[in-house]
From Swiss-Prot:
Its main location: cytoplasm. CDD domains: Nonheme_Ferritin (cd01055). Pfam families: Ferritin. Residues 2-145 form the Ferritin-like diiron domain. Signal peptide: none annotated. SUPFAM superfamilies: Ferritin-like. This is Bacterial non-heme ferritin. It is found in: Cytoplasm. It catalyses: 4 Fe(2+) + O2 + 6 H2O = 4 iron(III) oxide-hydroxide + 12 H(+). It comes from Staphylococcus epidermidis (strain ATCC 35984 / DSM 28319 / BCRC 17069 / CCUG 31568 / BM 3577 / RP62A). InterPro entries: Ferritin, Ferritin-like, Ferritin-like_diiron, Ferritin-like_SF, Ferritin_DPS_dom, Ferritin_prok. It comes from the Bacteria.
């Protein structure tokens, strides 16, 4: 059985994952509007991954005999000045998520809830990958600058990204 505090925090994180998916779809919409189809695809696939994360938490809560509670998803930011801004915002969002998982892990440790600690370790590993991915994209986009040819090739690479639930 999950403690009330841990259950509330898991429900909050589940909803945060669905918000992240919503935010990534807003970024995809910006990219589509600006005719950056490859970047739009990247964010659509990123949104799928966040929905998968939300569902993973949903399933865990229910598997523990508790009730997953879906909340209202607030409207995400929809205006951006550049592709680089979307990636910087994404990195900030992922860093916030990482901190949330650290806090969840601390709650689980305090509760001596070893099953939840084990469950959360998957997310902590995932967050290392997420932050690294966005840092790499930011570095690359910064180096590209206004080089349209290189940006075009980079976008083509991102157009091939697809999320695989594993």
């Amino acid at each position: 059985m999950l403690s009330k505090e841990l259950l509330a925090a898991l429900n909050e994180q589940m909803n945060q994952e669905y918000f992240a998916a919503h935010a990534y779809m807003a970024m995809a919409a910006y990219c589509d509007k600006e005719s950056y189809d490859g970047f739009a695809n990247f964010y659509i696939e990123q949104a799928k991954e966040e929905r998968f994360h939300g569902k993973k938490i949903y399933d865990y809560i229910n598997d523990r005999g508790e009730h997953a509670i879906l909340d209202t998803i607030k409207a995400p930011k929809v205006e951006f000045s550049s592709i680089l801004e979307t990636f910087k915002d994404s990195l900030a969002q992922e860093r916030d998520v990482t901190q949330r998982f650290y806090n969840l892990s601390e709650l689980a440790r305090n509760d001596k809830d070893y099953a939840t600690i084990s469950f959360l370790n998957w997310f902590l590993d995932e967050q290392v990958e997420e932050e690294s991915t966005f840092e790499t994209h930011i570095d690359y986009l910064t180096r590209i600058g206004d080089d349209c040819n290189t940006l075009y090739l980079y976008e083509k690479e991102l157009a091939a990204r697809s999320f695989n639930e594993q």
